[in-house]
């Protein structure tokens, strides 16, 4: 049993498996070299599938890393919510916004296109708003319970 648990932890950080997505994102935010404001608006009854949690964690980690390396920002906002926005069905929405210089792109060959590919496996999508001069806002959406 322990070896199976150890193997499964190789695919997800222990905090994610032991304490869930919110704790995992809190940990990422605390370790960021740029101050991160973490805002969440989640339904109390929300239970996410493990693959959704892993993808959301991975996307957040990559976006925070990209902001720290490339944005020139001095503040980041990380948002996590589950909502419908008037659309049919519920979705998990993860948004990272920084006050940096902008210029991020979803073009092939850029790191963000790989995140979009990862989300597409869950029928999710990634949207990037990053005008020259900033700010950059990246929004990941994954449908829940469809």
Predicted regions located by residue number:
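Coiled-coil dimerization/phosphotransfer module
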Residues: 1-146
């Amino acid at each position: 049993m322990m070896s199976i648990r150890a193997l499964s932890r190789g695919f997800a950080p222990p905090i994610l498996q032991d304490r869930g997505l919110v704790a995992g994102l809190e940990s990422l935010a605390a370790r960021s070299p740029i101050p991160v404001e973490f805002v969440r608006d989640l339904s109390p009854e929300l239970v996410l599938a493990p693959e959704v949690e892993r993808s959301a964690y991975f996307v957040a980690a990559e976006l925070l890393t990209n902001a720290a390396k490339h944005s020139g920002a001095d503040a980041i906002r990380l948002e996590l919510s589950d909502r419908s926005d008037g659309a049919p069905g519920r979705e998990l929405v993860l948004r990272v916004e920084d006050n940096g210089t902008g210029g991020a792109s979803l073009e092939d060959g850029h790191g963000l296109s790989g995140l979009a590919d990862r989300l597409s496996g869950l029928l999710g999508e990634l949207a990037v708003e990053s005008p020259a001069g900033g700010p950059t806002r990246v929004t990941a959406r994954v449908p829940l319970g469809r």
